[in-house]
Amino acid sequence: MYTEQYNQLNRQRVDWQTEEEVRLGWLTILQNTLAITFHAERGRSDADYNQVIIEFKNVGLFHGNQNSAKFQEALEELSRYIPAKAGIEGLDVRHYQGIAIDGESIAFVHISSENGQPIPGPIMPLSPDSVQMVFEACRQSCRRAVTATNLIEDFGHGSVAGGNLMQA
């Protein structure tokens, strides 16, 4: 379903040398394909969209190993960002999904609502299936928390709806 996006990411990753290039490559394709806007580096998370939080690392630093230092760092960061965002938005952490991406591999992470510990899924290589899983997680995250910030973004004077209302 997202074969073209996988092909674009696979072509681009050959040239990626920094975490920033991984982040820009992924976010550009996600936003253009799904017509959504990620919040980049808010609250120190690399990117978030509704209840999906993505943590990027430099190319290949997971080494396909859940015990690698950079994968453990990504887990630790997601285990801070997800509860923080859940607290701000007033939702349970189980509604949030973390995704760790190092340009060559992808892992999904949930936070246990019992003990707050990260529960990682397997580290998957970049493939049409793993890319589709990321796109579907983002596409299906359509529930926005009712917060002042979200209401201003959706209906304030800088939004499409707000602009249309002011011109009516």
Q: Which stretches of residues belong to each language-model region?
A:
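A short, conserved, highly charged catalytic patch centered on acidic carboxylates
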Residues: 1-97, 105-166
